[in-house]
Amino acid sequence: MSHAPANRPFDPAEYINSEIRTVPDWPQAGVQFRDITPLLQKPKSLRVLIDLFVQRYIDQKLDYVAGLDARGFIIGPILAYELNLGFIPIRKIGKLPFRTVSESYELEYGSATVEIHEDACKPGDRVVIVDDLIATGGTMMAGKKLLERLGATVIEGAAIVDLPDLGGSKLLRGAGLPLFTVTSFGGH
């Protein structure tokens, strides 16, 4: 007599992980690109993802969700809406129409700059920063510095994916930024 294995309980993080596509050698040879678009295309996986973030932050007494350009603009506004909070876009330089403050950071080959409006938040506001993934941590670190320069308290950085082999999560935690990620992948 054969026995079917007992059904395992639903694991949201495992499910999210299974919905992320790996594209080898993109955008260059040796890179394993973690593509979140399949996750976003399915209502169930998008709902599971947003629900994970909502559960994490519903009782945190936040004032804003800040999203990093560009894929943080996908999850960030949805999360802000679900939590009844405002959304702060942290943009690449030259994309915001009002007066801004900016922060430059190093990339693997060169540097980049992000900025926010100078009135994006006020001293004492509690903010979570969201993005699709944490690689080197440079963009999230720059966003943290910008928000803190305006007097906000960044309570946590959040991402769907952590790529710990690239050192970003270690860098951010070392700088005092707690992190929440749904899943992680080794390699580059």
From Swiss-Prot:
Which InterPro entries does this UniProt record tie to the protein?
Answer: Ade_phspho_trans (IPR005764), PRibTrfase_dom (IPR000836), PRTase-like (IPR029057), UPRTase/APRTase (IPR050054)
Keyword presence, Hydrolase: no
The molecular function terms of the Gene Ontology recorded here are: adenine binding; adenine phosphoribosyltransferase activity; AMP binding
What UniProt keywords are attached to this protein's entry? Cytoplasm, Glycosyltransferase, Purine salvage, Transferase
A Gene Ontology annotation in the biological process aspect, one of them, is:
purine ribonucleoside salvage
Where is it localised? Answer: Cytoplasm
Q: Which reaction does it catalyse?
A: AMP + diphosphate = 5-phospho-alpha-D-ribose 1-diphosphate + adenine
- State its Enzyme Commission number(s): 2.4.2.7
* GO cellular component terms attached to this protein's record: cytoplasm
Its annotated pathway reads: Purine metabolism; AMP biosynthesis via salvage pathway; AMP from adenine: step 1/1
Give the source's domain of life in one word: Bacteria
Q: List the disulfide bonds.
A: none
Q: Is Glycosyltransferase set as a keyword in this record?
A: yes
CDD domains, alphabetized:
PRTases_typeI
One Pfam annotation reads Pribosyltran
Q: Main subcellular localization, coarse class?
A: cytoplasm
Q: Which family does it belong to?
A: Belongs to the purine/pyrimidine phosphoribosyltransferase family.
Which function does this protein serve?
Catalyzes a salvage reaction resulting in the formation of AMP, that is energically less costly than de novo synthesis.
Binding partners and assembly: Homodimer.
Report the protein name in the record: Adenine phosphoribosyltransferase
